[in-house]
Amino acid sequence: MQVVVDNNQKLFNSKWPIVEAIMNQASTKKLALAISEAGGFPSLCAAPVGTASSIDFDPMYFELCDFIKANGSANVVVPLSVEWLSQKNFLKIVKDFKISHWEIFPRDTNTNTQRCLSEVLMDNLIYHGVKFLQRYSCVMGRLFNPVKNHPRLSILDAVTIKGSDGGGATGIGIHTVQETFNQQINYSKNVIPYGGIGSPHQVKNYLQQGAPAVGVGTLFAMCVESPLTHDVKLQMLNKSSTDIINIKGSTNGSLRQNAILLNSNIKTDGTDNKGNHTDDLTAGIHGNGTQGLIFAGHGIDYVTKIRTVRETIEYLTSEL
């Protein structure tokens, strides 16, 4: 598997081809540091606060500063949203920290992949200097469905693929991560499967098919170092993919999310949530196992105990 390791090191330069899929509220500094120390590649759910008309980038700035100081490098995947590109304070983050990997997220309710990889987005990246990241950073884009002939697809260093068996945002497609990967690998140089991954065989299989790395979310969320409370983790040990419900993120959009409900009273039709179930997620992560929800994918089927991050990465790479 030396070729696989070499391919991963060209894109991520980590010991193992295991990347932490960005998880809302769960991709914390503590988890990221543990993943980095264990030889995986970390992510950090660093984001500004406020609305599109009034964005405060200070929390994002200080969170990244804190992580980089503790980690000793800016080797981390951080989300990137279209509306930030015209903000001077965001460009300060770009220039000051030289983050190694940015992942472009679609931020509205339209999950159309053409929107995610639009010419407007790429023009803004270039105009505002983010193109400079190409010299020292990787720019990735999130896809829910295959894209074949988009004129700017070649600019991306990699695309991350999500499907019906992943956790959190899944779009409205019915294709699994593997099915979407099988199509996109014909059109893109680096395709990284996100979601539904929980076994050494899956990891080995994706790498042999040409993936430079695999994205892991649910298994890391169930690790000792994740922010989920111990009570919540114990409750999740009793769950499987049959407990996952595809819920609406909002009433006026197409965003769908795969989640395990810890409270049966949560409305799943999008009529009673703030910010795509953000409050429900907060209650789930920090609760006693009977509150809120947890975004989870089919990787939950492979969680049999609460492991450390190092034990999880050793398990996932045991067939390499």
Per-range role (PLM):
Residues 1-188:
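Active-site entrance/lid segments in N-terminal catalytic domains of soluble metabolic enzymes
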Residues 22, 195-196:
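Conserved donor-binding loops in enzymes that form glycosidic bonds
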Residues 26, 197-198:
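Residue-level detector of alpha-helix initiation sites
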Residues 156, 166-192, 198-320:
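Conserved active-site-proximal phosphate/metal-binding subdomains
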